[in-house]
Amino acid sequence: MANLNDSAVTNGTLHNPKTQQGKRQSTGCVKNGISKEAQQNRKAYAEDKPVFEPYQEAPLYVYVLTYMGYGIGILFGYLRDFMRNWGIEKCNAAVEREEQKDFVPLYQDFENFYKRNLYMRIRDSWSHTVCSAPEPYMNVMEKVTDDYNWTFRHTGKVIENIINMASYNYLGLAGKYDDSMVRVKDTLEKYGVGVASTRNEMGTLDIHKELEDLMAEFLNVEAVMSFGMGFATNAMNIPVFVGKGCLILSDEFNHTSVILGSRLSGAVIRPFKHNNAENLEKLLREAIIRGQPGTGRAWKKILIVVEGVYSMEGSIVNLAQIVALKKKYKAYLYIDEAHSIGCTGPTGRGVRELFGLDPEDIDVYMGTFTKSFSGSGGYIGGKKEIVDYLRMQSHSTTYATSMSPVVAAQLIRSLKITMGYEGNIGGMERIQQLKENIKYFRRRLKEMGFIIYGNDFSPVIPVLLYMPAKVSAFSRFLLKKKISVVVVGFPATSLPEGRARFSMSSAHTREMLDTVLEVVDELGDLLNVKYFPLKKSGRAILYNKEGFDNEASFEEMHSEPEA
């Protein structure tokens, strides 16, 4: 343990008094975080009290009606396919050529059928064209269709001042140019927009190194490697860590980028039930006892892959128990903090900080710069030898163009604001405001009678709508009321669990939230999607009290805020 007398507390984390540039800070400094006295007086927990992340189920009739709706849609879909085959109705869908009928099908049968006959009916709920910065208010171009959603055209009109509940602007750092972006402008003048090379050739700039050093300080790890694309950070780098003869234990709700990267690795993949430590331990025990299929040899590596905040569920990984299992069975842990870094934990350092765990408990930190930090790209952090190996072996460093220096400058700006080094409104104020917005919005939705998934610390708030017709109606109605929200359905979710997903931001004012809640309340009555009273399922997520960084975090997890 570092000596507090020789170190400074910066943004709630113990750091050496020497900064990145080698300059000393005063040993008593407090930057946007927790004082040394608070660190010294932090209470240890004597009890092991469980905390539940409630999972609520709709009444049975809702599932019955949802499947009936799909059944009717499928029947009409077959009827329309019959009419298309006989030329009665024009077919706008992509089809196989007759001479290639004996080839491997280009489209999976049901997914192609679903897209052609069901998704196409509600396709107007997605892919809107935004023509402004993703600020709390934004502008969207109006679109119409002349062929039942097969194609769209813009009318030339712009829908202005839409309340933005769809963008991942968690800390409110995305926006038009202001005085804090002077360095971004200077970087553009000095470096230009593009790098025109890969990281392993001529594409590593000093500003990339500065960004990576700052991110390593923020994460409290030895080294960080940055990448130009968040999706590729998972897809192209998981194969670097595991390959044939290795086992990946992946949460069933992990992101598509994790799934793709796992498949590309050649490792054996076994999903475990969402956030279920008991099921994960069962798979770990079986893997160690039985070994590799066919030969029974021991696995070269066992890699557990989880997310910090699950973007479709709004749930937070049960990290304390996952880490305990990782240590018990000598596995490795890879965590994707795309939706948790910057906005979760007392100082925004993610779920590791929220649970009060040691930074070395996690082997590979992955995250994106697109959410809290309002840029683009991703990063992987950890021990220096891991990151150095990644620099040499990753397809993203060998073949992909480096991150734009302008984006790197924006990310440095965002990180410094989050860490309290710059900005009129520091990271702690933004994180606290985001936390208050999340708790207020979730509480009000629950009081109205909606089914809400996820955790009270999650900036993602899913509202369950179930029926696909209600999913599209929800989106269309809100857009008419100048509110934007993401709606999600199959295959991004299970077939019956269509939902709306509200993304919270510290930039949302209470007046904005009240406006949205008033409209959503009216819409909930209109669509009959207030399913209270509800029956709680046994699928609860269990947390240990000792896993939290401080008592306030634990108490807030399972206490209702005051009105």
Swiss-Prot record:
GO terms for cellular component: endoplasmic reticulum membrane; serine palmitoyltransferase complex. InterPro entries: Aminotrans_II_pyridoxalP_BS, Aminotransferase_I/II_large, AON_synthase_class-II, PyrdxlP-dep_Trfase, PyrdxlP-dep_Trfase_major, PyrdxlP-dep_Trfase_small. PROSITE patterns: AA_TRANSFER_CLASS_2. It is found in: Endoplasmic reticulum membrane. It is an enzyme of class 2 (transferase). It is a single-pass membrane protein. Its cofactor is pyridoxal 5'-phosphate. Its EC number is 2.3.1.50. It catalyses: L-serine + hexadecanoyl-CoA + H(+) = 3-oxosphinganine + CO2 + CoA; dodecanoyl-CoA + L-serine + H(+) = 3-oxotetradecasphinganine + CO2 + CoA; tetradecanoyl-CoA + L-serine + H(+) = 3-oxohexadecasphinganine + CO2 + CoA; octadecanoyl-CoA + L-serine + H(+) = 3-oxoeicosasphinganine + CO2 + CoA. Residues 1-29 have a biased composition (Polar residues). SPT complex catalytic activity is negatively regulated by ORMDL proteins, including ORMDL3, in the presence of ceramides. This mechanism allows to maintain ceramide levels at sufficient concentrations for the production of complex sphingolipids, but which prevents the accumulation of ceramides to levels that trigger apoptosis. One of its GO terms (molecular function) is serine C-palmitoyltransferase activity. Component of the serine palmitoyltransferase multisubunit enzyme (SPT) that catalyzes the initial and rate-limiting step in sphingolipid biosynthesis by condensing L-serine and activated acyl-CoA (most commonly palmitoyl-CoA) to form long-chain bases. The SPT complex is composed of SPTLC1, SPTLC2 or SPTLC3 and SPTSSA or SPTSSB. Within this complex, the heterodimer consisting of SPTLC1 and SPTLC2/SPTLC3 forms the catalytic core. The composition of the serine palmitoyltransferase (SPT) complex determines the substrate preference. Belongs to the class-II pyridoxal-phosphate-dependent aminotransferase family. Component of the serine palmitoyltransferase (SPT) complex, which is composed of SPTLC1, SPTLC2 or SPTLC3 and SPTSSA or SPTSSB. The heterodimer consisting of SPTLC1 and SPTLC2/SPTLC3 forms the catalytic core of the enzyme, while SPTSSA or SPTSSB subunits determine substrate specificity. SPT also interacts with ORMDL proteins, especially ORMDL3, which negatively regulate SPT activity in the presence of ceramides. PANTHER family: CLASS II AMINOTRANSFERASE/8-AMINO-7-OXONONANOATE SYNTHASE (PTHR13693), SERINE PALMITOYLTRANSFERASE 3 (PTHR13693:SF56). This is Serine palmitoyltransferase 3. It comes from Mus musculus (Mouse). The gene is Sptlc3.
